[in-house]
A protein has these predicted regions:
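An N-terminal assembly and electron-transfer interface module characteristic of large anaerobic redox
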Residues: 1, 5-214
């Protein structure tokens, strides 16, 4: 949860103080805060406190039968091989092909620009696809890896859920692929068959990438 969620509908400013001695940027932020407060007072806007908690939607066995699982494109050669690997295990798995500037712009609308660039790409691809009208929003799910480490990649799943909530699509399940049991879903299981096929896809992806970029 970011500051924007904690202080939702309240005016706040975030000051970043590092090793430099020039506080010009901090002064500008404070002036902007004061200006925003004055504007709000003139408009007599009423504050409404909103809850910031998100309820996780479980991906069930029933959903597995007819739901399309969307996966953001994060490595073109590898993921083109992973898609058939997941499909062969009974998942209607689709790797998105919209990794372009437009999806990044969409990502900027739903993710704080202080987040890392890959998170903008990932969330942007997903939201661009869901907003395109191509998919039945009540028969679609999203999948994302969750490392469990200190990198923000662990929090991509939270970014996605927050974006879905902002777009009024909080009912769409977001499935976590992780090896640490962080989240589990009855309709999505990393069994030996799937892991073996995914491993082969990753290995051949490395081989093909080495040949292409040699």
């Amino acid at each position: 949860v970011g500051l924007g969620d904690v202080y939702k509908r309240q005016i706040y400013t975030c000051l970043k103080i590092d090793e430099v001695n020039n506080l010009g940027a901090a002064r500008i932020r404070v002036r902007s805060l004061l200006s925003a407060i004055r504007v709000r007072e003139k408009k007599h806007q009423e504050r409404k406190i909103m809850p910031t908690n998100l309820n996780r939607v479980i991906f069930t066995e029933e959903m597995r039968k007819d739901y399309t699982i969307l996966c953001p494109q994060m490595s073109p050669i590898h993921f083109d091989l992973l898609e058939p690997a997941f499909r062969s295990c009974g998942y209607n798995f689709e790797v998105l092909d919209n990794d372009n500037r437009h999806s990044v712009d969409i990502g900027l609308k739903y993710v704080n620009n202080d987040a890392c660039y890959p998170s903008l790409c990932v969330v942007g691809q997903i939201m661009d696809a869901l907003l395109s009208g191509k998919y039945d929003l009540h028969k679609v799910a999203v999948v994302i890896t969750q490392t469990g480490g200190g990198c923000r990649a662990t929090n991509y799943i939270g970014f996605i859920r927050r974006a879905l909530e902002k777009a009024g699509m909080e009912y769409i399940p977001v499935v976590s692929i992780n090896m640490g049991g962080i989240e589990t879903n009855p309709g999505f299981k990393l069994d030996a068959n799937l892991l073996t096929r995914a491993a082969f896809g990753a290995i051949f992806g490395d081989i093909f990438m080495r040949c292409v970029y040699h």
